[in-house]
Curated annotation (Swiss-Prot):
Short sequence motif HGGXW: positions: 33-37
Gene this protein is translated from: BNA7
Domain comment (free text): The main chain amide nitrogen atoms of the second glycine and its adjacent residue in the HGGXW motif define the oxyanion hole, and stabilize the oxyanion that forms during the nucleophilic attack by the catalytic serine during substrate cleavage.
The name this protein goes by in its record: Kynurenine formamidase
Family from the record: Belongs to the kynurenine formamidase family.
Catalysed reaction equations from the record: N-formyl-L-kynurenine + H2O = L-kynurenine + formate + H(+)
């Protein structure tokens, strides 16, 4: 482990950074950065300030604090960002015996967390559309795209069954990509098109706009989805000073969770702009108090 950095895959961005780890700790906090699926300036180091704030607390030593990188667009498109997150989790289960986990994600990091809660459906639809779009465009095959095999998917499900999801903290997230483009137009459509193969694919990429995920059903994370419904602590944070994302995405997410009859805790505060909110001490304290 070089400076707390370990590889969970072959790509240079398939990396985890262990800010704090003790194998005797029972609970792990995993942090997932944003950056519109494409910005190399957003990395696991985004969370240095949050980690520092958390470590001031006298009880912080009992938590493992880990952040992750994942492959970016346009090198890869959805759902490979989600697959990377899953591979990172699988790596932690298999190599560090981590089972109880809380996750906090910023911006598209929060998107990835939402996708995780229905990951099999999101992967199935995402890869299906990606393969169809790629064939139509470049006559590429499923093998060329390195779509995970059936065996890889089975092994992934086995690893995910061993995880107990405790708390998800969504920080200034994107939850409905179709509505995001409707609100902001061309500038946002540009980075979305970098990350997705077609409008159909990004419409199916999250539960809020998907035609295949039933809004009335519990999250289908795994066979223990009822436990996810009953035990997962959902926390939604939004800075009212965010210049890149208005309250609309957060309000849409709150409406969606309400339709699902799921409990959640919303927090809104003056925590600065989009790239400052996750650095704010108040946000760090909410995350720590929630896990």
């Amino acid at each position: 482990m070089d400076d707390g950095i370990v590889s969970y895959g072959e790509h240079p961005l398939n990396r985890l950074k262990f800010f704090q780890f003790d194998k005797s700790n029972d609970v792990t906090l995993l942090l997932i950065h944003g950056g519109a699926w494409r910005d190399p300036n957003n990395t696991y180091n985004d969370f240095k300030d949050m980690i520092s704030h958390i470590q001031k607390n006298q009880y912080a030593a009992k938590y493992n604090l880990i952040a992750m990188n994942y492959r970016l667009s346009p090198e890869v498109k959805h759902p490979f960002h989600l697959w990377d997150v899953l591979e990172g989790l699988q790596f932690l289960v298999q190599n560090y015996d981590i089972h109880k986990i809380s996750i906090a994600g910023h911006s598209v990091g929060a998107t990835l967390m939402l996708q995780l809660l229905d990951y099999n459906k999101i992967l199935d639809t995402g890869f299906q559309i990606l393969v169809e779009d790629s064939k139509a465009d470049k006559n590429r095959t499923e093998t060329d795209l390195h779509v995970p095999s059936k065996k890889e998917r089975i092994l992934m499900n086995e690893a995910m069954e061993k995880l107990q999801l405790r708390t998800f903290c969504f920080i200034d997230g994107i939850y409905d990509i179709t509505q995001l483009i409707s609100e902001y137009g061309c500038p946002y459509e540009s980075f979305v098109n970098n990350a997705f193969s077609s409008p159909e694919q990004y419409a199916e990429a999250t539960q809020l706009s998907s035609s295949t995920v039933d809004v009335g059903s519990p999250f289908s994370y795994n066979t223990h989805s009822a436990n996810v419904r009953n035990e997962l602590n959902l926390v939604i944070l939004q800075s009212n000073k965010d210049e890149l994302l208005s309250m609309r995405q957060t309000n849409l997410f709150i409406e969606y969770l309400t339709q699902k009859n799921l409990n959640f805790k919303p927090f809104v505060g003056e925590w600065g702009g989009h790239e400052h909110v996750y650095r704010h001490e108040d946000v760090a304290n909410i995350v720590l108090d929630s896990i």
